[in-house]
Curated annotation (Swiss-Prot):
Catalytic center residues: E273 (proton acceptor)
Biological processes annotated in GO: 3-methylbut-2-enoyl-CoA(4-) metabolic process; isovaleryl-CoA(4-) catabolic process; L-leucine catabolic process
Cellular compartments per GO CC: mitochondrion
Gene3D superfamilies registered for this protein in UniProt: Acyl-CoA dehydrogenase/oxidase, N-terminal domain, Butyryl-CoA Dehydrogenase, subunit A, domain 2, Butyryl-CoA Dehydrogenase, subunit A, domain 3
GO molecular function ontology, one term from the record: 3-methylbutanoyl-CoA dehydrogenase activity
EC number(s) on file: 1.3.8.4
Record's miscellaneous remark: Was previously thought to be duplicated, but PubMed:15574432 showed that the protein encoded by the second gene (2MBCD) is a 2-methylbutanoyl-CoA dehydrogenase.
Subcellular location: Mitochondrion
Gene transcribed to yield this protein: IVD
Pathway this chain belongs to: Amino-acid degradation; L-leucine degradation; (S)-3-hydroxy-3-methylglutaryl-CoA from 3-isovaleryl-CoA: step 1/3
Record protein name field: Isovaleryl-CoA dehydrogenase, mitochondrial
Cofactor dependency: FAD
EC category: oxidoreductase
Organism of origin: Solanum tuberosum (Potato)
Length: 412
């Protein structure tokens, strides 16, 4: 494990042992999921997120903007959270997806919006560059993305091409020295602020899935602009917009992977995208319990805390088991990916399960708080609105079910 995290975590742990203190930000029953180093990493990230991200969560949601008064990207970069799976030669930690999922969970626990933007930056953009970029591309783009100096994004979907990626209309015409892009991309997370974007466009409109190519787009390229920032139901502080390409020239060296192999680039990273993003709803479920448990212990009706009533205990038990089963599934799949086995049906399965359970857990959190749960002074409404995104983004629940069913059928 990276020495920076070891030093911070061990020092923190020794301090608590000496002073007989319990970890302030520990999650429930992780002893079966992590070794000591992984637990220390989780605790270290949890403390960072609760101190630096959680205090801004309400304002992020209310103002519909990623924080402007504090540079969270630089803070996360300084804490080495932006290059967890990146090889050390490019400035990363050289760790696996289990550690990446831990960080994504704890950041999402502090703020769903920041968690989603973090996932888009580190997994959709950085991970695609690591997996498919040339040495020169990695040297050029990764250091600034890992430090937080630059923000990353990925753009695949279009107004009329979501799950049906091959139907995209954005074109890339070959010219001397590169390509000229024309078209639009929709629902691009981090789009308004990103300096480095992975964008998919058709280089051969007659070749179907073999006619799509991935490009590295830089903010400021002539002909590239961002349109309106979208006003979303949830994940409001995760800035999202439409991208516009009007005769945008992209040099040949900015092709990511091979020409005509864009679908391979996309699909080869999609399983890992689903895995890492599945940490988001797990973090939201933890946030729900962080609010509900103290509330039902303090809130009194009929002369005693409502947490003593069996109906409330039943709801809390359901929330807890939903979270823990999703968490166990998540880290089991992450561990398998780190061992070299990337299972498509389980990467789809873990986000399908976690996303739908997170929506239900958030609904139960609102119910446990009663009237207060329906008031925006409390964060439970935000949890629900944020959780719902994960049933839609990175492939809808319906697409995930189709993938799982198809893979199971192929195995017979």
């Amino acid at each position: 494990m990276h020495k920076l995290f070891v030093a911070r975590s061990v020092k923190s742990a020794l301090f608590r042992i000496k002073n007989h203190q319990k970890p302030q930000f520990a999650a429930f029953s992780t002893s079966l999921l992590f070794d000591d180093t992984q637990k220390q990493f989780k605790e270290s990230v949890a403390q960072f997120a609760q101190e630096n991200i959680a205090p801004h969560a309400e304002k992020i949601d209310r103002t519909n903007y990623f924080p402007q008064d504090v540079n969270l990207w630089k803070l996360m970069g300084n804490f080495n959270l932006l290059g967890i799976t990146v090889p050390e030669e490019y400035g990363g930690l050289g760790l696996g997806y289990l550690y990446h999922c831990i960080a994504m969970e704890e950041i999402s626990r502090a703020s769903g919006s920041v968690g989603l933007s973090y996932g888009a930056h580190t997994n959709l953009c950085i991970n695609q560059l690591v997996r498919n970029g040339t040495h020169e591309q990695k040297q050029k783009y990764l250091p600034k993305l890992i430090s937080g100096e630059h923000v990353g994004a990925l753009a695949m979907s279009e107004p009329n091409a979501g799950s049906d990626v091959v139907s995209m209309k954005c074109k890339a015409d070959r010219v001397e020295g590169g390509y000229v892009l024309n078209g639009n991309k929709m629902w691009c997370t981090n789009g308004p602020t990103a300096q480095t974007l992975v964008v998919y466009a058709k280089t051969d409109v007659t070749a179907g899935s073999k006619g799509i190519t991935a490009f590295i787009i830089e903010k400021g390229m002539t002909g590239f602009s961002t349109a309106q920032k979208l006003d979303k139901l949830g994940m409001r502080g995760s800035d999202t917009c439409e991208l516009v390409f009007e005769n945008c020239f992209v040099p040949e060296e900015n092709v990511l992977g091979q020409v005509g192999r864009g679908v391979y680039v996309l699909m080869s990273g999609l399983d890992l995208e689903r895995l890492v993003l599945a940490s988001g709803p797990v973090g939201i479920m933890q946030a729900c319990l962080d609010v509900v448990l103290p509330y039902v212990k303090q809130r009194e009706q009929f002369g005693r805390p409502i947490g003593e009533f069996q109906f409330v205990q039943g709801k809390v038990a359901d929330m807890y088991t939903s979270m823990q089963s999703s968490r166990s599934y998540l880290y089991s799949v992450a561990r398998e990916c780190d061992s070299g086995t990337i299972n498509t049906k389980d990467c789809a399965g873990v986000i399908l399960s976690a996303a739908e359970r997170a929506t239900q857990v958030a609904l139960q959190a609102i119910q446990c708080l009663g009237g207060n749960g329906y008031v925006n002074e409390y964060p439970t409404g935000r949890f629900l609105r944020d959780a719902k995104l994960y049933e839609i983004g990175a492939g809808t629940s319906e697409i995930r079910r189709m993938i799982i069913g198809r893979e199971l059928f192929k195995e017979q």
